[in-house]
Amino acid sequence: MYLTLQEWNARQRRPRSLETVRRWVRECRIFPPPVKDGREYLFHESAVKVDLNRPVTGGLLKRIRNGKKAKS
């Protein structure tokens, strides 16, 4: 099921201004990304904001960076 930008924002724990949410969409901070339908964005009901400032520290990424010594 898809929600409009206003409906998706209203369901968030801390709703933000519509312009802020539109900026997040342009900066690809929403996953899965919303679909633009005419003049409005449609969000999947399970879409979430992704924090791009948080470093990605997965096990595979550590092994790629450090080689076999990081595998545990």
UniProtKB/Swiss-Prot annotation:
Q: Which GO terms describe its molecular function?
A: DNA binding; identical protein binding
List keywords of the entry alphabetically.
DNA recombination, DNA-binding, Viral genome excision
Q: Does the keyword section mention Thylakoid?
A: no
**What SUPFAM superfamilies does the record point to?**
Putative DNA-binding domain (SSF46955)
Q: Does the keyword Thylakoid apply?
A: no
Cross-referenced InterPro entries, in alphabetical order? DNA-bd_dom_put_sf (IPR009061), Excisionase-like (IPR012884), Excisionase-like_sf (IPR038137)
Which top-rank group of organisms is this from?
Answer: Viruses
| Residues making up the signal peptide according to the UniProt record | none
In its UniProt record, which GO terms are filed under biological process?
DNA recombination; provirus excision
Task: Name the Pfam families for this protein.
Answer: Exc
Quaternary form? Interacts (via C-terminus) with the integrase (via N-terminus). Part of the excision complex made of the integrase tetramer, IHF, Fis and Xis.
Q: What does this protein do?
A: Part of the excision complex necessary for the excision of prophage from the host genome by site-specific recombination at the att site.
Protein name per Swiss-Prot or TrEMBL: Excisionase
